[in-house]
Amino acid sequence: MLPLCSERELNELLARKEEEWRVLQAHRAQLQEAALQAAQNRLEETQGKLQRLQEDFVYNLQVLEERDRELERYDVEFTQARQREEAQQAEASELKIEVAKLKQDLTREARRVGELQHQHQLMLQEHRLELERVHSDKNSELAHQREQNERLEWELERKLKELDGELALQRQELLLEFESKMQRREHEFQLRADDMSNVVLTHELKIKLLNKELQALRDAGARAAESLQKAEAEHVELERKLQERARELQDLEAVKDARIKGLEKKLYSAQLAKKKAEETFRRKHEELDRQAREKDTVLAAVKRAHAEELQTLDAKVLELQFLCETLEGQLRRAECTRAEDAKEKNALTDKFREDAAALKAAWDAQITQMSKETVSKDFQIHTLQEEEMKLKAQVARFQQDIDRYKQQLSLAVERGQSLEREQVQLGLDWQRRCDDIERDQIQKSETLIEGLTKARDQVAAKLQETEKALRQQETLLKAVSLERDQAMETLRTHGLLPGQEAQVPPQQHEGEIRADSPSTEIQRLQEQNAGLRNAVSQMRREMEMLSGHLPPAQPEECSNADPDPKAGGDSTPPDYVLTLEAEMQNLKHKLKALEEQLQSTEEPVKTSVATADPHHGVHSSAAAADAALADQTSTALALRKLGDRVHLLNLLVTQLKRKLRQKPRELVPVQHEVPSEVDQVHLEVLELQKQVAELRKHLKVTPQGEPSSREQLQRQGVADRYPMGMEDQTESPTFPQEGAQPPQTIYVTHLQRKLKDAARKILSLRLEREQLLEMGNRLRAEQGHAKGKPTPCPGPPTSEPQDPQEVPERSLDRGPPLGQLQPYSTTQDPRHTKRRCASEYAGKSQPHSAQVGSKTNTPRGHKAEMASRPAQLSQKQHRIPTETWKPVYQKENRTPKLPQAHEVPEESDHRTHRSSSLASSSLQDIWRLLELGSSPSGVPSQDNSVAECPAPSRPSCFQKVNRSPVPIQKAFAVKGLKMEAQPKATPPRPSKSHPAKPTNCQQQRPSRIRNYNLKD
């Protein structure tokens, strides 16, 4: 019985212990939930404190703005002081006037003495002895007075000079000291502002991380609550027995909460006391701010208070981190205990005693943790009190530096005004020098180019005369050969010739004659061609030497201030990038049109060579094939060059877009890079337009051959060009039939229509280029505003906004001549003037460069219609006067080196070298095009990788080129994105006949006193 009773008692004891253990587990879970909720409440309280601190920071910023207004008032007082100083100077001038009056009195006294002497001389006979004595006395007195007056004048002048020298020395010393101190102070304040901004950003990042961690802790707490609810459902019976223990724990919690509330009340009272102290401090300083010197002290005090508040924020953030770490430790402990509970459920009953001991140890650890938290709060309150004492000491120390700041600011204003005046004067002087040098260089280049064009025209005239002489010799040779053949036939019929000569057939003899005559003609033509090549190469060498000896423009000295580093944060591309893209699309369409012309010229030549009789007209077919091959090689080379240039422009535009879409950098390198890249793109566009015009002219010159082959080429060219996609025609042309219009008139009318379209598009390009220049001027004006310098404002427009369809007609008919330059204003940007001259030069020479006139002055240009601009189809068809094509044709081959050589070198040296290399390469390309146009047989290229065909294998090479027209078109195709060009309204511009000179508009001078606490 004893063992049974002992077993029952043990079972009951085990059940009681098990219930007690479960109740303790539930109570422990409740305690952990309460601790988590208390930590969340503390976190909310800290967030409220942080919000209040932010509001205090905003209030401090408002106080700083009030201080800035007071500084402006100080500026007004400083101007009044300057006025008083000017009044003192006026008083000094009045004193000088009084000195002059004294001198006049002295002269009057001298005159009176002379009159007395004259009177004494009249009475000399009666009173000679007395008069001599009186005269000697008077003379001695006058001499003594004169010496005294001269001594006084000399002393006064010496004192004035000494005072002037001392004033100058004092001014220089004060200026030097002020500049050094201002630079030092500015550097220190900038470093402090950067540190403060970095600290604020780090605090914001830390707060975000803490918010994320708290959210994760809340989720974990929710999951723990769910698990605890399940445990409570299982252990409801054990809770009944442990209610007394729970009441004791609740009492302990109440005591702990009461103590926490007491500490919070103390903290709140300390904060209220701090606020009251701050209010009293602020009121005292507001009263002291009524005086001039003590108002600036509050500014420094607020700055230091702001720094200390940031330090307190750091301390509070560290406290929050510490609390989060404690919460994480508690959660980890809860998870460990939960795992231990799962293991202990499956363990033996003997381990319950050890679990009870573990619960007691955990309870003791929690109590120690709570005591540590209270101690840390007491320590925080003590640190806050110490920081308040430090703040008061710092405010007392910073009151001494305010007077020096005021003096330094006044001296800085004077120094800045003097520097601005000197800078404006230097800019005007350098601009005048650059304008004079540019005019001289442009005049020299124009005279040189006119001489070269005249020499080229003379060489062309000589070549035409030699061709006429060759034709006459050919006709004479043919007539002589026919007479000789007739004589030989008559001799053979009569039997007068010997037997060997009679056996020779007449056809073979005619073949020998025809074989001999072309060889001599070819030799003569080759000799003439070699002479022409030598002349052209000599002219090219002279041009390159002259372009190499052009002097660079004078450097412009200007001091750029530090602009706003966060200006221009918009990632959308500006208008001038869109205009560059529109010009790129125009050039791509030009390339496509030239490729279509090349393909249309290749196919007729191929058919004519295939259908020609091999035994009849050998010389004419070979000459036509050689000329066609030369034209194909020259056009292929030029098209490849244009493709490379278009690819380069694509790269430049993408680089500009990438730079604008990236994170905005400092404004100074952007100011230096963007105008230079825009200028480079402009130069490339001008060179491409010139080369397109020359290629168009070169393609329209048909090779001289038999009339039948030429008519066939024209017919097939018309048949091939019409289906190539001219979008502006409503009716598709057909092949000429019997009784229809001849193909030559159809081709001429078609070319006239295309020339009108090309002229209209070139004028639209010119308007877009002018808009781009205006945008660049606006950008420079904004840069000048950001630097705080007086910028030139454009003059009022003299003409009202006009219809964009009427602007091209006026620019064609009323534009100034090419050699005439517009007047330069002294306040205009030299880079703008250079680019404007270049754009006007290109805009006036480009519409006429596409015309190659015959004796009837028929236009023969060609340009494909753009598919992406249907809005331009309804514009007016502008008529280009045909009387003015000759002088423009003489001036269309100008090199782009001339406007580029006078560009002011505001950029680095490598940019100037790059621009000169681009100009020299464009010059070499133009000379190669001249050589290609003058030579009847193709000239081997040095830059491109086109294989050269030898003279005997020309027909085979020609066939190979004709067999594969599709790969050539693919090789010259330019890949790009289609963009719909948006129509832009042309801004109102002043008329070119009366250009309005811009004047300097005196803008409102911004405040020179910088607030170092406010971020830029």
Curated annotation (Swiss-Prot):
Bias type Polar residues, positions: 846-859, 934-945
Organism: Mus musculus
Record gene name: Ccdc57
Record keyword Cytoplasm present: yes
Alphabetical UniProt keywords: Coiled coil, Cytoplasm, Cytoskeleton
Principal location listed in the UniProt entry: cytoplasm
GO CC list: centriolar satellite; centriole; centrosome; cytoplasm; spindle microtubule
Protein name: Coiled-coil domain-containing protein 57
Top-level taxon in the UniProt lineage: Eukaryota
Signal peptide: none
Region (Microtubule binding domain): 604-1016
One record GO biological process: microtubule nucleation
Coiled coil: 14-607, 676-700, 748-775
Region (Centrosomal targeting domain): 1-503
